[in-house]
């Protein structure tokens, strides 16, 4: 069973629909018991970093999530804002992140040659060989909507990069923790492949 963390933030219905399409048994829940019994976890999120972290903390789930991810080593996928929340902090606010990956999130600088937020389809470039990237290559396109991007302290944590007037991190991976800046649930066949890979991770 995959549990999509339901803390009131994120495209939960879209994520569940995509998981259903790849044949996964999944549910949205804010129950500690469900989280403890889950095989894998997905942390969705949209909006501002501080609001997301405050809402997650008010849900009372941070401790059980941290136990399941960092001690029990359950695979977790952070999506969009959820990926940034895996890190230490964001320039967007003052709230501390979950700290599961040593990284910050920083804002794209405004320039004449690009708009902020970065919105729309963009190609990604794999930086690591990993089972979660099976079938994903330089031709794979994903849907982005974001003004901030992840900056891991360790370059070996960069799973995918992307170019938007500069090279930036589109996805991170450390052990059982995965973060995707784009919206795989809105990325059609490429997003479906990514969810399929996550479901099949051992």
Curated annotation (Swiss-Prot):
GO terms for biological process: L-histidine biosynthetic process; O antigen biosynthetic process. Its EC number is 4.3.2.10, 3.5.1.2. InterPro entries: Class_I_gatase-like (IPR029062), GATASE (IPR017926), Imidazole-glycPsynth_HisH (IPR010139). It is found in: Cytoplasm. Pathway: Amino-acid biosynthesis; L-histidine biosynthesis; L-histidine from 5-phospho-alpha-D-ribose 1-diphosphate: step 5/9. It catalyses: 5-[(5-phospho-1-deoxy-D-ribulos-1-ylimino)methylamino]-1-(5-phospho-beta-D-ribosyl)imidazole-4-carboxamide + L-glutamine = D-erythro-1-(imidazol-4-yl)glycerol 3-phosphate + 5-amino-1-(5-phospho-beta-D-ribosyl)imidazole-4-carboxamide + L-glutamate + H(+); L-glutamine + H2O = L-glutamate + NH4(+). PROSITE patterns: GATASE_TYPE_1. One of its GO terms (molecular function) is lyase activity. Keywords: Amino-acid biosynthesis, Cytoplasm, Glutamine amidotransferase, Histidine biosynthesis, Hydrolase, Lyase. Its main location: cytoplasm. SUPFAM superfamilies: Class I glutamine amidotransferase-like. GO terms for cellular component: cytoplasm. It comes from the Bacteria. The active site is at 80 (nucleophile), 183, 185. Residues 1-202 form the Glutamine amidotransferase type-1 domain. PANTHER family: IMIDAZOLE GLYCEROL PHOSPHATE SYNTHASE SUBUNIT HISH (PTHR42701:SF1). Heterodimer of HisH and HisF. HAMAP family: HisH. IGPS catalyzes the conversion of PRFAR and glutamine to IGP, AICAR and glutamate. The HisH subunit catalyzes the hydrolysis of glutamine to glutamate and ammonia as part of the synthesis of IGP and AICAR. The resulting ammonia molecule is channeled to the active site of HisF. This is Imidazole glycerol phosphate synthase subunit HisH 2. It comes from Pseudomonas aeruginosa (strain ATCC 15692 / DSM 22644 / CIP 104116 / JCM 14847 / LMG 12228 / 1C / PRS 101 / PAO1). The gene is hisH2.
């Amino acid at each position: 069973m995959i549990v999509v963390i339901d803390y009131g933030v994120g495209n939960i219905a879209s994520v569940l629909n995509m998981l259903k399409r790849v044949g996964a048994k999944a549910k949205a829940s804010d129950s500690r018991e469900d989280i403890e019994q889950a095989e894998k976890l997905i942390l969705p999120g949209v909006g501002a970093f501080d609001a997301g972290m405050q809402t997650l903390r008010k849900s009372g789930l941070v401790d059980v999530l941290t136990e399941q991810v960092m001690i029990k080593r359950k695979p977790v996928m952070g999506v969009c804002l959820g990926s940034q929340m895996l890190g230490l902090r964001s320039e967007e606010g003052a709230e501390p992140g979950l700290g599961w990956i040593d990284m910050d999130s920083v804002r794209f600088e405004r320039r004449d040659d690009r708009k902020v937020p970065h919105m729309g389809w963009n190609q990604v470039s794999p930086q690591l060989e990993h089972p979660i990237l099976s079938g994903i290559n330089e031709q794979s396109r994903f849907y982005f909507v974001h003004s901030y991007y992840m900056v891991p302290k360790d370059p070996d944590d960069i799973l995918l990069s992307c170019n938007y007037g500069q090279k930036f991190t589109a996805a991170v991976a450390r052990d059982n923790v995965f973060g995707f800046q784009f919206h795989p649930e809105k990325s059609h066949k490429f997003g479906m492949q990514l969810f399929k890979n996550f479901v099949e991770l051992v």
